[in-house]
Amino acid sequence: MQRLNSSRWRWGLFGLGLLLFGGISSQFRSDAKLPTLAPLPQDPYIQAYFNHSQASVYADPYRRISRYGDDLEQVMIDAIQSAQTSIDIAVQEFTLPHLAAALAQRQAQGVRVRVILENNYSTPMAQRRPNDFSFLDEHDRNKANELYQFVDLNQDGTLSPDEIAQRDALTILDQAQVPRLDDTADGSRGSGLMHHKFMVIDGRQVVVGSANWTMSDIHGDLGVEESRGNANALLVMESPSLAQTFGAEFALMWGDGPGGQPDSQFGLQKPPRPARLASVPGSVVEVQFSPTSPTRPWANSVNGLIAKTLGQATQQVNLALFVFSEQPISNQLWTVSQRGVPIRALIDPGFAYRSYSEGLDMMGLTLPDHRCKLDSNNQPWPTPITSVGVPTLAEGDKLHHKFAVVDNQVVMVGSHNWSHAANTTNDENLLVIRNATVAAHFQREFERLYDDAQLGLTPHLQQTLDRQRTQCGL
């Protein structure tokens, strides 16, 4: 294969960093042979899928392993292949080449395909330069390293044109002339985050969830044998009404498309949009999009809708959250708890024990930040609960969910993290779905995570509290 100019593609220290990841074995061990649980019934209009489901097994197409879980990428490919007229996608990150190839095929067959990305993840491999990565933080630098390794099929530390054409999702889209833009299309340097993860097909179907279209969010980290992907959910929803609502959100961000006027609207440039009902047979579905300006009533925001829905609980509340840092939601949960409603919460280990985590509030704890400051609005629960903690995850994997199950009847799910930034800055979505069949799927996922979770004041958390309090002289 012809090689690109070495000065362009031999990326110095960046390439050396790949050595930390090691080579990719052509064969990993299989940890799954048969499902351990029977599949739950699916609603005919709302199907729920989970990449860690114990009720199914699939073959990871990139790492060549058999593993438990629903193949979220294949679910999306099947939806793409069903498209007859149009596919509109808004997703923060997109690096999976099989998905890109499916879109390229539909584009070639006359289906209109349009893609919106977050600007930090919208540059194809062929246009990247070494200094593109020197300014990244450790998290994004590791992502860049893994993507480079993923595209470098023969693992020689150099990317060939053929490797890029086969493996780089954005290059595949560009070669197929799939139009795309990012959140700089409004003339700005980008919104807070274009954090959506949705697809609208033929004005009739919405595919939406918490997963980015990446190895880490769908299948697992490339260089970590034990990784099975960040825990995520995906919904396939058949509803022209819902598709129209998501289509309107897409249209605001798309404007007149690439190369046109800077008339795209992202972030707070979009008009205020209250929660609205969508018609889905057999369900009551509300949908709302972020952000909401801090100058508007908090109750009218997505976080306000979350708090309102939690406040209706009478039996139980179960939370599986990547991050939970919005104080008013914690305050609402305290009120619910005081009515005797059991509450259980799991938060990603990377965020659960940070000074701003509402998980600490629920446990009645306070933790100073690195400046020895306490959040001015911090409100630890006077009567703590011990059913709050972190799931046990494989190395490299995260609890990326953003869902709550209320009374085994209601699910809240979407791209929206329970944070101030998601509420007031980012492009996000939240669905409130009242459907016991759908709720049962999310309840099963919660129980899977809760089964071996580390709850309450763990030794690790106690050590963290003691260390920080000593450093701060408290």
Placement of each model-derived feature along the sequence:
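HKD-type phospholipase D/PLD-like phosphodiesterase module
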Residues: 29-83, 93-311, 351-409, 416-431, ...
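Low-complexity, Gly/Ser/Thr/Pro-rich intrinsically disordered linker/tail segments
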Residues: 290, 318, 404, 468-474
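N-terminal Sec-pathway targeting helices
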Residues: 2-17
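Extended non-catalytic domains of envelope/secretory-pathway proteins
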Residues: 309-310, 319-333, 337, 347-352, ...
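Cysteine/selenocysteine-centered motifs that mediate thiol-based redox chemistry or coordinate metal-sulfur cofactors
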Residues: 241-266, 273, 441-474
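Hydrophobic alpha-helical membrane-insertion segments, chiefly the h-region
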Residues: 17-29
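Short, surface-exposed connector motifs at secondary-structure boundaries
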Residues: 81-87, 111, 311-318, 339-343
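Short catalytic-loop micro-motif centered on adjacent basic/acidic residues
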Residues: 87-91, 181-182, 316-321, 345-346
